[in-house]
Each structure stands twice: as C-alpha cells, then as structure tokens.
C-alpha cells in the first residue's frame, strides 16, 4: 500500500476515468479512492489550454483538500498539461499520457491506436 491513511485521487473530464478506478480497485484493494469526473464541463477537447488548466486546478484543489496522497489524471486531454499542473500542488500527480508512453517503450510496441480529442493530438504529447 502507498500510504495507508490517505486516499488516491482519480480525475477525468467526464466518466471515462471510472475504468481507471476499477483497475486501481483490482490491483490495490486496500486503498480508498476519491473520483472526480467533471461531467458538468465536458468535453474538454474543444476548450483552450487556459480553460482546461483552470478546470483541472479546481479538481486538483478539491482532491488535495480531501487529503489525497496522489492523483492519477485519467484523461488524455488534461494529462497534456501535467507538467504545468504539477508545480501548483504538493502531492504527486500521475499522467496517463506519460504512463502510456512508458508502457509503449517498455513493451517495444511499434503500432498503437489512440482515441483522443483534437486538443490532445495537437499537443504532440503522443508523437
């Protein structure tokens, strides 16, 4: 277990991140999880970088205020801003983009399919 007293945060722009929650519950059954899916403002893919940043900061503040030890960003679009978000918070923020890229390299994959918003594709983070 990571840190028994504090929950893990998972955030997404909608409900897709519930698949991440389900997998975390499977591999870390003793961990508490707080999920924040911002379905009120989705989709994020047609928003500006600053709009996505502000909405993401609101979610991360909420999760931090609720004592998470780390947060997994379960949204490709938000993950493209993880380098900009991390300095604003004093707990670990894990990007699905970075973790997916590590997996592709580790497994020596040469072809990968991706469902992404225009914002995510334009960011070049998966290039």
What are these regions (language model features)?
Residues 1-127:
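Non-catalytic structural scaffold of enzyme domains
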